[in-house]
Amino acid sequence: MTTELADAESRLSGVGLRVTAPRRAVIAAIGALEGPFTIEELTAAAPGVGRATVFRTVKLLQEAELVCRMVLEDGGVRYEASAGGHHHHLICSVCGGVTEFSDPALDLLIQENANLNGFQLAGHSLELYGRCAECTHRAG
């Protein structure tokens, strides 16, 4: 068992969730996929686990902060393992590449704005769209 798989199972157990065989299969499939994935790609990578079970498991993994959800510029949704904790995304509109970044000052600014407006923040997601350095260079 990989360290990441063991950590994911431990975190699920730690928040009171059972680690069933289908959940274990989904976690293993996430570990085998490279980069962001769709529910369909994850379902294909977890043979024998139904789409509804994959979807529910991904939702639980999001709540346990083990998976991060991204909304792409075209409205499509992709997910990724998020063992590194909370982060944001720069998404290239040309090649579809995703770059993760963390900025505690930005997170503090978001929290301060929520507080100023009397808003109790439960969480946030930030995706920035544009052109990556490589695509910008290729475009001249």
Task: Provide a role label for each language-model segment.
Residues 41-45:
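A short acidic, leucine-rich amphipathic alpha-helix
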Residues 54-65:
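Basic amphipathic alpha-helical segments that dock to polyanions
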Residues 24-29:
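Pre-recognition alpha-helix immediately N-terminal to the DNA-recognition helix
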Residues 21, 33-38:
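Short capping segments at the starts of secondary-structure elements
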Residues 2-16:
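Short, Lys/Arg-enriched N-terminal segment that forms or immediately precedes the first helix
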Residues 63-140:
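Non-DNA-binding regulatory cores of transcription-related proteins
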